[in-house]
Amino acid sequence: MIEIDSIGHFPSSPGVYIMKDAEATVLYVGKARDLRKRIRSYFAASGDSRYQIRFLMARVTDIQFIVTDTEKEALILENTLIKKYRPKYNFNLRDDKTYFSLRMDMSSDFPRLSIIRKVTRDGARYFGPYSSASDARAVLKHLYKLFPLRHYPMETCRRRNRPCLFYQLKQCSAPCHGKISREDYMALAEGAALFLEGKNREILKIFRERMSAAAAAEKYEKAARFRDLIRSIEVTVEKQKVVAQGGDSDVIGFYREGEQLHIALLFLRGGTLTGSRNYSFSWEMDDHEGIASFLNEYYNQEVFIPSEIVLPIAIADPLPQEELLCELRGRRVSITVPQRGNKLELVRLAIKNAETAAAERKKAAESGEAILQTLKERLHLHKLPRRIECYDISNIQGQMAVGSKVAFVDGKADKAHYRRYRIKGVSQSDDFAMMREMFSRRFKPGTAPDDYPDLIIVDGGIGQLNVLTHVLGDLQITDVEAAGLAKSRVDREMGATEISRSDERVFLPNRKNPVVLRQNSAPLLLLARIRDEAHRFAVAYHKKLRGNKLLASQLEAIPGIGIKRRKELLRHFGSLKKISEATLEELRQVQGISATVAESLWKHLHENEKGDTNASPFVNFE
């Protein structure tokens, strides 16, 4: 184990730190604004609260660091190193999930960047992908400091009496209030796009030309703004090693394991490795055909298509594939198979990523099976609980009561089988009666036995469990097992200085004493995760209903908006939320809504914003 004395030479600057074990295996890669402070926090009693940290530090024998000029550079370098080394304690596989991109429509008067899930071929420019929304937001946060583009829709900003707080922070140029010309704003937007594409030399060239032109025209204030922007870009431009010359490219590697084909996709943007994605599927044909099929399947989705796709092996007749990709992208796309140099090294890195992902999938599957087997034994179940459902209730003193059902298959969320229930037959605060109604609707007569779960979990103790077992008994459902997961309780004795909590307990039918699983064990963490997901899903639905009711009450209180006009508004916009977001012009287009009524409606919905430059123009649904 490493000692705290060995980190005294760490600088107080931004950078990336790499933790290794005695065999020089990379265990963890992290970034920090202040390297010395961050590393020292691992040794402090009040340090990092993640439970893995105590196990991590017991194995760490060496910590190395790489100093960067900016936090943004550290963020990008951290992601690059994680993709390269796949450290055990950074492990957070996001396979087959939606990634995020940044979108900017340059055809609008004042383009803005937004985070989106799908890349559509609508003429806008897309940047990414990013493995999480938080990664995309981190990039935006740094970008706004260099290129102060607007953050919100123009209509939203114009409702305010003066520019928003971001303008005061110099992170928005306030085009909504005429603080910048369209020409200058478009220069910022183009600079931001080139910056995201890694074309920093082009940005500096364009901005130097604009600075010179402004100075020649004796527009010295404008020239000074470009001068400051150029200096900021020069300071912020990443010193990260460029791994390949050229523009954007995707590098593909694969690993075959029996009938399972594992594919790794590395994203290079502006010559820099920015991310990766892994896929796995059954494939009985040869590898060449498998890669060709993957290209077809992947790039025909709504994804970004780069100018070059680098393959580990040649595919039969690549020209038609190139032509199709060119048509989809609207520009030239080349498919290459490198034989030497940096691109061959990148292909080898992609192959290594595919091998690692395959091993991790296999290990995760074996671990998941072991967890389910432990649950079967500890809860005395008759079969392995491959399909688990969990239910929860959310209400405020019986008002707007809702129920939720979440489903997990082999320990993973099966969101296609999530369900929400609006409780209709219970008018008072009676959770047991609400659960009885929800279970009766879920297991109503005629439900196919194939649709039954192996195990049902209820959020609660013996009372909630009894409701479930009575409903199952009344419906003569005998092949579904049940359990109640009761949260831990606070145990505080008089005079005690610390608060202690009891263990979480699992109640079973026809058993007086609950089963107590070892705290922080994998089986208990799985049950708790399922229980918490059911609670989240129920609360989210309840908040949505509360928001709708609030807006409906607002509509009813507006003079001139009767039942007929409310129905017409809902028919036109489709939801109460969209009514609240509508512009004055959009309200005027509704049949039966005159200009006077539309103005009254719009003012009523946005009256809280007057005098508050940072107030949200929308009803808070969350």
Curated annotation (Swiss-Prot):
Q: Where does the UniProt annotation place the signal sequence?
A: none
Gene (name only): uvrC
InterPro entries from the UniProt entry: DisA/LigA_HHH, GIY-YIG_endonuc, GIY-YIG_endonuc_sf, GIY-YIG_UvrC_Cho, Hlx-hairpin-Hlx_DNA-bd_motif, RuvA_2-like, UVR_dom, UVR_dom_sf
The answer to keyword DNA repair applying to this record is yes
Q: What is this protein called?
A: UvrABC system protein C
Please list the residue ranges annotated as the GIY-YIG domain.
12-91
- Which PROSITE patterns would you find in this protein's record? GIY_YIG, UVR, UVRC
Pfam families in alphabetical order = GIY-YIG, HHH_2, UVR, UvrC_RNaseH, UvrC_RNaseH_dom
Localization, UniProt: Cytoplasm
Query: What is the source species?
Result: Geotalea daltonii (strain DSM 22248 / JCM 15807 / FRC-32)
Chief localisation class: cytoplasm
| GO terms for MF | DNA binding; excinuclease ABC activity
**Which purpose does this protein serve, as stated in its record?**
The UvrABC repair system catalyzes the recognition and processing of DNA lesions. UvrC both incises the 5' and 3' sides of the lesion. The N-terminal half is responsible for the 3' incision and the C-terminal half is responsible for the 5' incision.
The reply on keyword DNA repair is yes
Which SUPFAM superfamilies does the record associate with it?
Answer: C-terminal UvrC-binding domain of UvrB, GIY-YIG endonuclease, RuvA domain 2-like
Q: How does it assemble?
A: Interacts with UvrB in an incision complex.
Alphabetized, the UniProt keywords read: Cytoplasm, DNA damage, DNA excision, DNA repair, Excision nuclease, SOS response
Kindly state a single biological-process term from the GO annotations of this entry: nucleotide-excision repair
Question: Which family does the entry's similarity section mention?
Answer: Belongs to the UvrC family.
Enumerate the spans annotated as UVR domain.
Answer: 201-236
Output the SMART domains linked to this UniProt entry. Answer: GIYc (SM00465), HhH1 (SM00278)
Which Gene Ontology CC terms are recorded?
cytoplasm; excinuclease repair complex
Q: Which domain of life is it from?
A: Bacteria
